[in-house]
Regions:
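N-terminal cap/lid segment of alpha/beta-hydrolase-fold proteins
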Residues: 22-89
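Short substrate-entry loop that stabilizes the transition state in hydrolases
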Residues: 87-91, 96-138, 216-217, 240-244
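Alpha/beta-hydrolase active-site loop
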Residues: 145-167, 187
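Short glycine-enriched nucleophile-adjacent loop
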Residues: 164, 182-197
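Alpha/beta-hydrolase fold nucleophile elbow
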Residues: 168-179
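Conserved alpha/beta-hydrolase "nucleophile elbow" surrounding the catalytic nucleophile
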Residues: 177-182, 236
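The feature captures the conserved acid-bearing segment of alpha/beta-hydrolase catalytic domains
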Residues: 199-268
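C-terminal catalytic histidine-bearing segment of alpha/beta-hydrolase fold enzymes
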Residues: 260-376
Length: 376
């Protein structure tokens, strides 16, 4: 009986039942600082009928720049695209932030497309966010120095603030994303960050990070879950791009009531396990596995002294740690690039990973049911 029920779920949420052929979409022509890729995506077959929403956000360097309000020095306009179920009733909304592949994920990633279609079919709205084009990038997978990691999380929180007053929002929100998008999901689960944007201790109701970067993102060393949140951490056990071990360890460190945070490591699955084809070698994808770990204390300062030693004493990029944080507030993108230049000199940056897998239909029911159970 149980096996039959699981089979039914797989059939119900099967991607093969929802025809989708990635369109011939020119991301270069549709992505500029003054033109979000979502403008073009909203006109494609299968994506039309939604609402373009532009909202104010900020560009920061890391969590410390947010804690000390340094991000307020760098306002930016961000574009989101909201797709809602038919009708006029109020619904929950899942906010998607994209991977290092950029907002083109929403077009070319079959799983992202089908997941959104299934959520909408179940009565849950979806908002895509373009974290890159306004910041002068289309993708970052070859060069992660282009856009600081924290900014996808800032955008997601600013989008949540805007959607709280949307006439069709019922006040319940989820968020998800893969890789860099999954990293954003981890960021917004911590009360120390979310409380800078939202009132009180509450944040997203349901958070599902996939294949996040947990060792090099600048997460709090002592994380604490927002009070209203259920979280499901999913990672491929064979992932050599973003390593599962560190996300499992970080999730286990999160201060939260029992049962609020669940971890599912999929043995044998690689990064982008729902790509719809067999794993392949991506030679140009950047990794930082040999660099010193990057976590911060509750004040947002480095917990690993190697970073200050490199920036201040060895490479003399800044006169002091405080001078670095001051520079990071004024020009976060420049400070981020400076950090990558130091890592290149230290020869701790590598390239080459295995990505892909044909696990869409196996994974889809788990993904959809997590949001149904926690938002509907």
């Amino acid at each position: 009986m149980k096996k039959s029920f699981l089979t039914l779920l797989v059939i119900l949420f099967s991607t093969s039942l929802l025809a989708h052929e990635p369109p011939n979409f020119n991301s270069k022509d549709n992505c500029r600082k003054k033109l979000s890729m979502l403008q073009g995506i909203s006109k494609l077959k299968g994506y039309d009928g939604g609402e373009i929403i532009k909202f104010n956000s900020y560009t920061g360097f890391d969590q410390r720049t947010v804690l000390i309000d340094g991000h307020l020095n760098n306002p930016i306009e961000i574009t989101g695209y909201l797709r809602l179920p038919e009708g006029t009733g109020k619904v929950p909304i899942v906010i998607y932030t994209h991977s290092s592949g950029g907002p083109g994920d929403y077009v070319w990633d079959d799983f992202v497309y089908h997941a959104a279609q299934n959520l909408i079919k179940e009565g849950i709205g979806v908002m895509y966010i373009d974290n890159f084009c306004p910041r002068g990038a289309r993708s970052t997978w070859r060069d992660q120095s282009k856009v600081p990691l924290i900014n996808g999380a800032i955008d997601a929180l600013m989008a949540l603030k805007v959607l709280q007053s949307h006439p069709r929002s019922n006040g319940k929100f989820g968020t998800t994303g893969h890789s860099r998008g999954g990293t954003n999901s981890f960021f917004v689960s911590d009360i120390k960050l979310t409380s800078k944007f939202l009132d009180g201790t509450k944040g997203f109701h349901a958070i599902l990070p996939e294949a996040a970067e947990c060792r090099m993102a600048g997460f709090f060393a002592k994380p604490e879950l927002t009070s209203n949140t259920k979280m499901l951490v999913v990672h491929g056990g064979a992932d050599d791009y973003t390593l599962a071990k560190f996300c499992k360890e970080h999730a286990e460190r999160i201060k939260a009531p029992p049962g609020k945070v669940k971890i599912d490591i999929k043995e044998g699955w690689y990064h982008v396990w729902h790509a719809g084809k067999k794993p392949w070698r991506e030679k140009m994808a950047m990794t930082l596995h040999d660099c010193p770990d990057f976590y911060v204390d509750n004040d947002g300062r480095f917990t690993n002294p190697t970073w200050v030693e490199w920036m201040v004493n060895k490479h003399k990029k800044y006169a002091s740690e405080d001078a670095f944080y001051e520079a990071a507030q004024e020009n976060p993108s420049k400070a981020w690039k400076t950090g990558f230049k130091i890592m290149k000199k230290e020869k701790c940056i590598s390239k080459g990973v295995t990505i892909g897998g044909d696990n869409m239909d196996v994974y889809m029911p788990q993904f959809i049911n997590f949001f149904k159970e926690n938002l509907l």
